[in-house]
Amino acid sequence: MRGDTISSGNWIIDNLNSSLETWNDKLSEIWTLLTTSPENFKGGGIWNVIVGINDALKAIAYALLVLFFVIGVMKTCGSFTELKRPEVAFKCFVRFVLAQAAVTYGMELMTALFSIAQGAIQTIMGASGLSAMEASTLPAEIATTIEDVGLLESIPLWAVTLLGSLFIWVLSLVMILTVYGRFFKLYMATAIAPIPLSSFAGQPSSNIGIAFIKSYAAICLEGCVILLSCIIFSQFASSPPVVTEGLAPATVVWNYIGELVFNMLVLVGSIKMSDRIIRELMGLG
């Protein structure tokens, strides 16, 4: 998305263009990250480490599997005589086998959930008609207004553009950190997955496994909310600014930066709240 920066000869315009290019770079990076799987993220090196940790924790998970199973049998069966009943014994046996399968094939289960979420992201991208994020550029009207000001009038514009550029840079950083944080949550959940999945062995403890699966699904679906936020922002940013004649150049630029930063704040806020939105929709509290 980012091309070579061409200097306009005006420091104020160059500063705004540089800030917008930084913002566009981060949006482009987010667009790429949303279509990247954990296996391919950063060359796959992190994923290989996570897979190794997941395999190592399976030994602990199998021990917990037996513990959860025994505790579950003791709480659900009133006596040993009740356990001798064929239907009760069969039910406990099936639960243990399914819990063991969840621990053994937990990695396949989690990658399947992520693939479903990625399919939803690809569908949203296709339906939106966007192959990439629309770049935010400095409108010609604003550039003309800045170029027409004199030396004295340009002094307040310097302060306005410096403040606006700082806001844009900070918002860009917060936005990309949030998206990277989603990958870290995916990795951490995948690494410790065998332990919470082992809780399916006992009926009283199965709520732990259910909550874990729902939380992991919520992390995967955060990508859909982030993508929708970016698409909505692109529609906001595509509308041209309203330039009122007769206003001072500093006021015109300030109004433009204020509107731009407001739209960016809406996007960053939506991305930051993506986990909360998904949790509320899925009833996770």
Feature locations, PLM:
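Loop-to-transmembrane-helix entry motif
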Residues: 53-60, 96-100, 177-180, 187, ...
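Binding/recognition "hotspot" determinant
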Residues: 1-64
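Alpha-helical membrane-interface segments at transmembrane helix boundaries
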Residues: 50-58, 90-94, 98, 147, ...
